[in-house]
Amino acid sequence: QVEDDVVDALASSVKDAYPDLSHRYYKLKAKWFGQEQLEYWDRNAPLPDDSDKRYSWDEARSMVLEAYGAFEPQMSDIAQRFFDERWIDAGPRPGKDSGAFSHPTVPSAHPYILMNFHGKSRDVMTLAHELGHGVHQILSGPQGALMSDTPLTTAETASVFGEMLTFRAMLEGETDPARRKILLAGKVEDMLKSVVRQIAFHHFETKVHDERKV
């Protein structure tokens, strides 16, 4: 569990940073769209010159493993097992659930990853994110069934770390300025949705509960 004071401090810090985070970015995006103010429904619209480069599954695998290995070879070695032993269900097909997750099962077995890979840069990030969970789950397995499970705050730290390792490697390997702008914009929007939007939800729900108490 996360203490209430910690949650309140986090929420306040993010809210105080709204002008420097979401407000600043959306003003910039409005300029890219030739608008004075960005419309609400255009917040997540692709940039005008976004052709969304496609990656093969093998390219995505190599990018993630190389990014992991550059940080720590053991991290890459563990992630490699997910490919070699077919612990990843990535192919889209009719009737398959959407979304993505890494299920830890039990420590005596191994995790399974579900995702839908369409070759977009965001799919590469999803693969890196879920493998971050998977590596974490493998490493926590020796703690046993009662101690290996982790709260979301800890689990998401591992997954976002793996995702950011891969993103930085992808960005450093991209030489086209327009493509670099698209990658950075996509990552900023992902982080706004993961952090700023969630805090906005939190503030709304807190107000609803406070009003209900009155």
List where the protein language model places each region.
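Cation-handling catalytic/transport regions enriched in His/Asp/Glu
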Residues: Q1-V214
